[in-house]
C-alpha cells in the first residue's frame, strides 16, 4: 500500500493519475476508485488529465462497480435485492408473526415507517459486517429479541425466494478470500481518491485487496503543517489525518508528501492557510491581499428566489464573457428548500442544468394513479379518488372536457360510494346534463374497477394477474406513452415504468404463493412506488451541475456558486433516527473489531471542517458564497464559517432586491427579458409584500378615522380597477338589433347592485356550482309548491286536512323525494320546512275575504321595442270589491323601501304591479297592492311576556302579515286582513309614479347594457362601507382602495322621505 498526501494548492487527482499511468504503462490493470457521489465527475476529470484522453487500462469506477468486473461471471444467478423488495420481504415476515410474538414492536407490524426503519437497519448491518445477533447492549433486551425474530424470518424468506443476501462487496470479498481471483488481482493496481473514511465493509475489502493486488494507492489532502501536529482535535484536516494515521498504523506504512505540476491560484491557498490557523490555534502575520478578493464573493440576499435570480444573472454574464455551462457548479445548502425553485428560475433564464440527485417518483402521474386506485378500493369508491384517477390521464380514453363534465355532474348529484356509482345516473337539473353520455362514461369507469375490486382474498400471483388485466383494459401502457411532451419526459417515464414493472415483479415473486386481500396488495405496491426514486442522465455534458454542497470536492469547476449557507445548514448537524440510538451503536462498536456502525453524530465536527475546506477550494477561478436572510419562510443567521471569512477581510455584499435595470445581466436573455417586462408592467402591484400591503391598509383606515374627527378629508385614490367595453362584434351577437332584451326583476337588481356582476351572470352566463342537496332555492320551491296546492284546494274539507294533503302530495313528487329523502340531513331540513308551512298557513285561513285568482302566473311585460320583462307571479288575490293584488312568497324577511326602490335595488313588487295591470281583465281597473309573505316559523322571546295568554298568540300572528305596497283607496277592505299598511299606503297617482319610474329604471339599464361596457361598481350607502357584491376573487375590489368606483346610493332623511323620493322619481322619469 502507498499513502500519499498533498496540500490543497495542488491537484491530488493529477498526482494519482500519474501513479495510475505508471502502473498502466507497466502492464497492470488499474482501477481508479472514487466515492459513489463523485464517480461521474471524477471519471471526466481523470480522462481529461490523460494525454490520450482515454484508455482501456485505467477504469474509473466505484467499489461496488469494481466488484462486478471480477464477479460477474462467477456470481450465482439469484434475484437482486433492492430497498423495495426488502420492504416487501419484511412485510411478509411481519404478516407471519402475531402481535404477542413481538412485545416491543407488535403494535407497529403494519406501520410503513417501521418497515422502512427495518430496511435501513438491515442495510446498516450489512455495511457494518454485523449480524442481528451482534446487537447486544441495547437499552431494552426485548428489542433485540424482536429484531432477531423479524430479521431471521426475513432472511429465511430471502433464501426460499432465492434472493442474494450478500452485497456486491461481500461477494467480492468472499471470492478473494477463497483465492478465486488471485491471478487477476496480482495484475491489478487500485488507486483510491476522494475518501476520508471507509465503512466496515469497504475496510474489510481493502485489507483483502492490499494482500492480493499488486499495489493499493490512496491519496488525501493534508497540509504539511497539519501532518506535523501532535494535537489535531478541531483541526480542519482532522478527518483526513485520522484517515491516514489509521491506515498507516494498520498497514505499517508511512504516508509520503507529493506535489503536482498544476498549482491553483494563490488566493485559495492563502484563504486555506488563514482558515487552518484559526482552528489549530496558531497565528499568521499577514492578511488576504487586495487582488485575492477578486476570486471570492460573499452575498447576502433577502430570500431564496432573489438569491437564485442573482446566481442566474451571474451565470448569464459568465456565458457572455465566453465561458460555458460545464465550467459552472451550483451548490445548495438545503436541497429540499431549493430544489423546487431553482428549476423554474433557471428555465426562465434558459440555463440548462443537471440536478445531481435522484428524483422521487411520488409526484409522477403513475404514482398518483396507483395511490388513487388504492384509496378508491379502501374508502369504497370515494368521489375524489375516482376523479383523481381520471385526471392522472392514465385511465381509459377520456378527454379533459369529458372528465370535467363527469366531475361537474358527480358533484351536483353527490355521487360517492359504490352504490351510487354502480346505478345509472337519473337525476338532472336545469342545466340538462347529457345523462346518456355520462352513463356510458360511468360504465367505462365502473366495469373494470368493479371487476378488480370484487376480488376476494387469494394468492398474490392471482391478484397481480387481475391487476395486470385491469391495467390492460384501461390502456395504461398506451396512456403512459401519451403523457410525454418532450424527450426528457420520455426518458423520465421510461425510468418510472421500469421501476413500476420491477415492483410488480418483486411482489409476484415474494407474495405469489401467499394469500392476500386486494387492499394489502395495492397498499404494498403504492408504498413501493411512493418510496422509489429514479435518475435521468443529462442529454449533454454542457450543463450547469447542481448538487448538495457536502458532496463537493476540491478544484471541481472554474466557477462555483454555493447558496443557502445559513447557520442551520452550514455546517450540517446530522442526527441518526432509527431503531437504534447512537448510544446503542457506540456500545456495540466498543465490542467489535473491524466491524462497526457508522455514527454520523460523532463525526459531525471533523466532517464539517473537511466539507468547509473542500468548499472553500471548490473553484479554480471564482467562488461565490451566498446566504439568504429568510429560508423556508424562517429567518436564519450567517453560518459561523462565513463569519470567519468576514473576519479574514472578505466583504459581505448585500445584493438586495432584484431591481429592474437595463444592465446586460438583466436584458441579455430573451425569456428573462420577457419576464422582466411583465414585472415592469406590474411594478406598482409588486412593490410591497402582502404583509406590507396589510400594514398600510390598516394604517390608512386609522388615518381616515382620525381625519374625520378633525373634519378633514383624504383625497380618494384614482380608479385602479378598469374594464374594457365589449367589441362591436360581441355586442351584435349578444344584443342583436331588432330583438328586445329580456330582463327580469332579479336581473335588474343585479345590474344596479354591481354592473360587473350582471356581466358575469347574464352575458357570460356563469353559474355557481349546482348541488342536489337542498339549498335556499330548493327550499323556496318546496314552500311555493305546498301553498300552490293548498290554495287550489276548494273542497269543503277542514283547513287542517287540506294542509296535510298539500304537504303529503308535495312530499310524494319525485324531485322532492330525491332531494329530501337522500340522507338524514335532508330529512331534517324537510321537517323544518313542514313546521314553517304549518306556522304560516293560518294566515291564509284567516283571510277568508280574499279569492285566489291565479298562481305561478307567467308574464311578459312589454316596455317598448328594446325590452321585454318576464317573470312569474306567485299568487294573484282578489278582494271582495273585485280589486286585484300580487303576493310574492319569500323564505326570508323582505319589506318594500321606497329609497331602495329608487336606487334600483328593489323593483320586484312594482314590476309585478305593472304586469298585473297589463294582464288584468278589462273590467277590473283597481289594484289593491303588491306584497311579500314571509314564510316562517315565528320565534318569540318568552322572557318578554309576563304570562302565557292571548298576547302571546297575537304576537305570533303579528309576525305573519303581508308587507309591501298598498292602495290607499282599498284601505277599508285591507283593514280586516293581515296586511301591514302603516307607512305603506299609496294613492293612485303615487302608484302611477312608481310604475313609470320602474319603467325608467329598466330602460336606463337596457341602454347601458347594450353599450357593452360594464363597470365594477358595487353600491355603498354611506361612502364608508360597501354593501354591494364586490366579487373580490374576480375583480380584486378593495373598499379602502376602490371606494371611488363604488356607486353611491341616494339617501334622504326619514322625515318626508316618501314625498321627496316621489318628487325625484317624477323629475327623472320626466313626469
Curated annotation (Swiss-Prot):
The keyword DNA damage applies. Its cofactor is Mg(2+). Pfam families: ADDB_N, PDDEXK_1. One of its GO terms (molecular function) is double-stranded DNA binding. InterPro entries: ADDB_N, DNA_helicase_suRexB, P-loop_NTPase, PDDEXK-like_dom_sf, PDDEXK_AddAB-type, Restrct_endonuc-II-like. The keyword Acetylation does not apply. Keywords: ATP-binding, DNA damage, DNA repair, DNA-binding, Exonuclease, Helicase, Hydrolase, Nuclease, Nucleotide-binding. It is an enzyme of class 3 (hydrolase). GO terms for biological process: double-strand break repair via homologous recombination. Its EC number is 3.1.-.-. Belongs to the helicase family. AddB/RexB type 2 subfamily. NCBIfam families: rexB_recomb (TIGR02774). Despite having helicase-like domains, this subunit does not have helicase activity. The heterodimer acts as both an ATP-dependent DNA helicase and an ATP-dependent, dual-direction single-stranded exonuclease. Recognizes the chi site generating a DNA molecule suitable for the initiation of homologous recombination. This subunit has 5' -> 3' nuclease activity but not helicase activity. Heterodimer of AddA and RexB. This is ATP-dependent helicase/deoxyribonuclease subunit B. It comes from Streptococcus pyogenes serotype M18 (strain MGAS8232).
Amino acid at each position: 500500500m502507498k499513502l500519499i498526501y498533498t496540500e490543497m494548492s495542488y491537484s491530488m487527482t493529477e498526482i494519482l493519475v500519474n501513479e495510475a499511468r505508471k502502473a498502466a504503462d507497466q502492464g497492470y490493470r488499474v482501477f481508479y476508485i472514487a466515492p459513489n457521489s463523485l464517480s461521474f465527475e471524477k471519471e471526466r476529470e481523470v480522462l481529461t488529465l490523460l494525454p490520450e484522453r482515454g484508455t482501456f487500462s485505467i477504469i474509473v469506477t466505484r467499489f461496488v462497480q469494481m466488484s462486478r468486473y471480477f464477479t460477474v461471471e462467477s456470481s450465482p444467478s439469484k434475484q437482486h435485492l433492492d430497498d423495495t423488495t426488502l420492504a416487501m420481504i419484511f412485510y411478509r415476515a411481519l404478516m407471519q408473526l402475531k402481535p404477542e410474538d413481538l412485545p416491543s414492536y407488535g403494535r407497529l407490524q403494519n406501520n410503513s415507517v417501521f418497515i422502512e426503519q427495518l430496511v435501513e437497519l438491515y442495510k446498516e448491518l450489512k455495511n457494518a459486517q454485523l449480524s442481528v445477533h451482534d446487537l447486544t447492549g441495547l437499552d431494552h433486551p426485548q428489542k433485540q429479541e424482536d429484531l432477531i425474530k423479524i430479521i431471521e424470518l426475513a432472511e429465511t424468506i430471502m433464501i426460499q425466494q432465492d434472493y442474494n443476501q450478500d452485497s456486491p462487496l461481500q461477494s467480492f470479498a468472499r471470492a478473494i478470500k477463497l483465492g478465486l481471483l488471485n491471478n487477476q488481482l496480482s495484475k491489478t493496481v487500485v488507486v483510491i481518491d476522494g475518501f476520508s473514511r471507509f465503512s466496515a465493509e469497504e475496510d474489510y475489502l481493502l485489507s483483502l485487496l492490499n494482500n492480493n493486488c499488486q499495489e493499493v494507492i490512496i491519496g488525501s489532502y493534508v497540509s504539511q503543517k497539519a501532518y506535523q501536529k501532535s494535537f489535531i482535535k478541531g483541526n480542519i484536516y482532522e478527518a483526513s489525518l485520522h484517515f491516514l494515521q489509521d491506515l498507516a498504523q494498520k498497514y505499517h506504512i508511512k504516508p509520503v508528501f507529493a506535489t503536482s505540476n498544476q498549482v491553483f491560484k494563490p488566493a485559495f491557498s492563502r484563504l486555506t492557510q488563514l482558515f487552518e490557523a484559526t482552528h489549530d490555534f496558531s497565528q499568521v502575520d499577514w492578511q488576504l491581499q487586495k487582488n485575492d478578493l477578486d476570486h471570492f464573493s460573499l452575498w447576502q440576499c433577502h430570500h431564496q428566489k432573489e438569491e437564485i435570480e442573482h446566481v442566474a444573472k451571474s451565470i448569464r454574464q459568465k456565458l457572455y464573457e465566453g465561458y460555458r455551462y460545464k465550467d459552472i457548479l451550483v451548490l445548495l445548502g438545503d436541497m429540499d428548500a431549493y430544489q423546487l425553485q431553482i428549476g423554474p428560475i433557471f428555465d426562465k433564464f434558459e440555463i440548462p442544468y443537471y440536478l445531481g440527485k435522484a428524483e422521487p417518483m411520488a409526484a409522477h402521474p403513475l404514482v398518483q394513479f396507483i395511490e388513487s386506485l388504492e384509496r378508491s378500493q379502501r374508502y369504497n369508491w370515494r368521489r375524489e379518488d375516482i376523479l383523481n384517477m381520471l385526471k392522472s390521464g392514465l385511465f381509459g380514453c377520456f378527454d379533459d372536457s369529458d372528465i370535467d363534465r363527469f366531475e361537474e355532474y358527480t358533484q351536483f348529484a353527490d355521487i360517492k360510494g359504490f352504490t351510487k356509482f354502480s346505478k345509472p345516473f337519473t337525476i338532472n337539473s336545469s342545466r340538462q346534463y347529457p345523462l346518456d353520455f355520462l352513463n356510458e362514461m360511468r360504465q367505462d369507469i365502473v366495469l373494470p374497477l368493479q371487476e378488480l375490486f370484487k376480488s376476494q382474498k387469494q394468492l398474490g400471483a392471482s391478484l397481480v394477474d387481475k391487476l395486470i388485466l385491469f391495467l390492460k383494459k384501461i390502456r395504461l401502457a398506451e396512456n403512459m406513452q401519451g403523457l410525454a411532451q418532450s424527450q426528457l419526459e420520455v426518458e423520465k417515464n421510461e425510468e418510472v415504468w421500469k421501476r413500476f414493472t420491477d415492483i410488480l415483479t418483486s411482489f409476484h415473486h415474494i407474495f405469489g404463493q401467499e394469500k392476500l386481500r386486494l387492499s394489502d396488495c395495492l397498499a404494498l405496491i403504492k408504498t413501493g412506488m411512493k418510496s422509489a426514486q429514479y435518475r435521468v442522465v443529462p442529454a449533454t455534458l454542457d450543463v450547469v451541475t447542481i448538487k448538495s454542497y457536502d458532496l463537493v470536492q476540491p478544484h471541481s469547476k472554474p466557477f462555483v456558486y454555493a447558496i443557502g449557507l445559513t447557520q442551520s445548514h452550514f455546517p450540517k448537524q446530522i442526527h441518526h433516527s432509527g431503531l437504534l440510538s447512537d448510544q446503542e451503536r457506540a456500545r456495540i462498536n466498543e465490542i467489535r473489531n473491524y466491524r462497526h456502525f457508522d455514527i454520523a453524530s460523532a463525526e459531525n465536527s471533523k466532517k464539517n471542517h473537511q466539507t468547509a475546506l473542500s468548499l472553500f477550494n471548490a473553484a479554480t477561478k471564482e467562488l461565490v458564497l451566498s446566504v439568504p436572510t429568510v429560508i423556508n419562510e424562517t429567518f436564519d443567521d450567517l453560518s459561523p464559517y462565513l463569519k470567519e471569512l468576514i473576519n479574514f477581510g472578505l466583504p459581505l455584499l448585500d445584493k438586495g432586491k432584484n431591481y429592474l435595470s437595463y444592465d446586460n445581466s438583466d436584458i441579455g436573455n430573451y425569456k428573462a427579458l420577457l419576464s422582466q417586462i411583465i414585472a415592469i408592467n406590474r411594478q406598482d402591484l409588486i412593490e410591497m409584500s402582502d404583509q406590507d400591503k396589510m400594514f398600510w391598509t390598516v394604517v390608512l383606515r386609522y388615518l381616515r378615522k382620525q381625519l374625520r374627527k378633525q373634519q378633514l378629508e383624504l383625497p380618494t385614490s384614482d380608479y385602479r380597477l378598469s374594464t374594457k367595453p365589449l367589441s362591436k362584434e360581441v355586442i351584435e351577437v349578444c344584443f342583436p338589433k331588432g330583438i328586445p332584451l329580456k330582463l327580469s326583476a332579479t336581473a335588474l337588481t343585479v345590474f344596479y347592485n354591481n354592473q360587473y356582476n350582471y356581466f358575469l351572470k347574464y352575458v357570460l352566463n356563469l353559474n355557481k356550482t349546482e348541488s342536489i342537496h337542498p339549498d335556499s332555492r330548493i327550499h323556496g320551491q318546496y314552500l311555493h309548491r305546498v301553498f300552490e296546492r293548498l290554495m287550489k284546494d276548494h273542497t269543503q274539507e277542514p283547513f287542517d286536512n287540506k294542509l296535510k294533503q298539500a304537504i303529503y302530495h308535495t312530499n310524494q313528487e319525485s324531485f322532492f323525494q330525491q332531494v329530501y329523502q337522500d340522507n338524514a340531513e335532508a330529512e331534517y331540513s324537510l321537517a323544518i320546512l313542514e313546521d314553517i308551512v304549518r306556522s304560516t298557513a293560518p294566515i291564509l285561513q284567516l283571510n277568508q275575504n280574499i279569492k285566489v285568482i291565479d298562481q305561478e302566473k307567467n308574464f311578459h311585460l312589454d316596455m317598448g321595442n328594446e325590452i321585454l320583462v318576464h317573470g312569474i307571479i306567485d299568487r294573484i288575490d282578489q278582494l271582495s270589491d273585485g280589486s286585484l293584488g300580487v303576493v310574492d312568497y319569500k323564505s326570508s324577511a323582505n319589506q318594500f323601501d321606497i329609497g331602495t326602490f329608487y336606487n334600483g335595488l328593489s323593483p320586484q313588487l312594482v314590476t309585478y304591479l305593472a304586469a298585473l295591470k297589463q294582464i288584468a281583465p278589462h273590467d277590473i281597473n283597481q289594484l289593491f297592492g303588491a306584497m311579500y309573505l314571509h314564510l316562517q316559523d315565528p320565534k318569540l322571546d318568552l322572557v318578554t311576556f309576563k304570562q302565557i295568554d292571548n298576547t302571546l298568540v297575537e304576537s305570533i300572528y303579528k309576525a305573519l302579515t303581508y308587507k309591501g305596497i298598498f292602495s290607499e283607496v282599498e284601505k277599508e277592505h285591507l283593514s280586516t286582513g293581515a296586511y301591514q299598511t302603516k307607512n305603506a299606503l299609496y294613492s293612485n297617482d303615487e302608484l302611477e309614479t312608481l310604475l313609470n319610474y320602474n319603467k325608467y329604471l329598466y330602460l336606463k339599464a337596457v341602454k347601458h347594457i347594450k353599450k357593452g361596457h360594464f363597470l365594477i361598481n358595487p353600491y355603498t350607502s354611506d361612502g364608508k362601507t360597501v354593501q354591494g357584491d364586490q366579487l373580490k376573487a374576480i375583480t380584486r375590489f378593495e373598499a379602502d382602495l376602490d371606494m371611488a368606483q363604488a356607486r353611491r346610493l341616494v339617501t334622504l332623511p326619514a322625515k318626508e322621505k316618501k314625498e321627496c323620493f316621489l318628487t325625484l322619481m317624477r323629475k327623472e322619469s320626466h313626469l
